[in-house]
């Protein structure tokens, strides 16, 4: 018999929606939650997200658990019988698993409340433009603000049954990068009468990598990746405009500031050298996921006692996650949940092993009961 929460995952997988458009997802979650025992539950909507408070039997504090609910603008290529029914959208980062796990834990505590209050945060827009910071600033969250908060993220590189975590920095600071170049277009045969923005932008791609190699401490780490470049409209016309879209990843806020300062300095030089206008356009910025050492060590001890084969020491990763905003103000941690997939996060063929769902539910129930 198919596990109930694996079945839920498959239903959620078919209705992927991007940030702040998670209307079907929200409706699905609300419908499920409405069927749970309601004696100890309070439910609030926040935009396309949901907050659920499970009132404790003798509460002295509130413990938070957060899951993200949005999907990515990726065309699915898994070939699964329960593949996305929303063309161009896919749960390619495991948020369908995240939600089903959260529902599994919530279902348990709705029937068997813990001593303390539990707050379940179903957060929209993790993939962009970022939902963690605005939901934290909301009146709805403020009323039920937890004293600690936890979360997980699937990890294709770990086996089912493995949990990877470390105290301190787990995920990097991330900043989306959108740059436009505006020059002077013209006929392809007369480059001397134009300012070619394809040339300017492509040269900028290479030059910005010197920031990493020459401006960042070799004992530190940072990444600038350009994932999309667009310039011009037709093959025999010199491009008047060009655009670079990418991301910056650093292991500290200070290093992020260095990268941005140098990018802007380079841009000023580019304007002079290529006789163009260079403009940076706003994108999402995500704060590092910095696990509280005391909370994390307590969880590691819990795993070693209760799930001795599961704990794997993690390394810091350049992955970005806006859960970092929660941890910047509230003690807690995030961990990697192994799902053993040959394809990476954000890949059109990502197919996590679903056995990770009941395993994670079991771990989280026992951990939260121990708090």
Curated annotation (Swiss-Prot):
SUPFAM superfamilies: Bacterial exopeptidase dimerisation domain (SSF55031), Zn-dependent exopeptidases (SSF53187). Pfam families: M20_dimer, Peptidase_M20. It comes from the Bacteria. The active site is at residues 68, 127. InterPro entries: AcetylDAP_deacetylase, Amidohydrolase, Bact_exopeptidase_dim_dom, Peptidase_M20, Peptidase_M20_dimer. The keyword Hydrolase applies. Catalyzes the conversion of N-acetyl-diaminopimelate to diaminopimelate and acetate. This is N-acetyldiaminopimelate deacetylase. It comes from Listeria monocytogenes serotype 4b (strain CLIP80459).
């Amino acid at each position: 018999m198919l596990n109930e929460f694996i079945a839920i995952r498959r239903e959620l997988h078919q209705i992927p929606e991007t940030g702040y458009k998670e209307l079907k997802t929200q409706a699905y979650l609300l419908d499920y939650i409405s069927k749970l025992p309601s004696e100890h539950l309070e439910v609030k909507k926040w935009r396309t997200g949901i907050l659920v408070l499970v009132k404790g039997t003798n509460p002295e504090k509130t413990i938070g658990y957060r899951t993200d609910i949005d999907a990515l603008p990726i065309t699915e290529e898994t070939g699964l019988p329960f593949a996305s029914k929303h063309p161009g959208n896919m749960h390619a980062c495991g948020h369908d698993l995240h939600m089903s796990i959260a529902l599994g834990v919530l279902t348990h505590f709705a029937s068997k409340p813990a001593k303390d209050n539990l707050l379940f945060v179903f957060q929209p827009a993790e993939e962009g433009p970022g939902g963690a910071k605005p939901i934290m600033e909301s009146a709805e969250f403020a009323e039920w603000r937890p004293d600690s908060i936890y979360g997980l993220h699937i990890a294709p590189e770990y086996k089912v049954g493995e949990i990877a975590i470390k105290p301190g920095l787990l995920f990097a600071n991330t900043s989306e990068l959108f740059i436009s170049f505006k020059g002077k277009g013209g006929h392809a045969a007369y480059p001397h009468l134009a300012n070619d923005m394809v040339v300017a932008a492509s040269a900028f791609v290479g030059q910005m990598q010197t920031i990493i190699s020459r401006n960042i401490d070799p004992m530190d780490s940072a990444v600038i990746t350009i994932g999309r470049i667009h310039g011009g409209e037709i093959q025999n016309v010199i491009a008047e405009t060009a655009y670079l879209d990418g991301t910056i990843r650093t292991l500290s806020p200070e290093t992020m500031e260095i990268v941005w300062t140098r990018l802007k300095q380079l841009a000023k030089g580019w304007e002079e050298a290529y006789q163009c206008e260079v403009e940076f356009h706003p994108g999402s910025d995500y704060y590092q996921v910095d696990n509280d050492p005391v909370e994390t060590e307590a969880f590691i001890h819990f795993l070693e006692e209760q799930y001795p084969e599961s704990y794997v020491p993690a390394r810091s990763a350049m992955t970005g996650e806006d859960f970092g905003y929660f941890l910047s103000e509230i003690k807690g941690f995030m961990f990697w949940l192994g799902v053993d997939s040959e394809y990476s996060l954000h890949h059109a063929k990502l197919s996590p092993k679903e056995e990770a769902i009941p395993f994670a539910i079991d771990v989280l129930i026992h951990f939260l009961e121990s708090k």
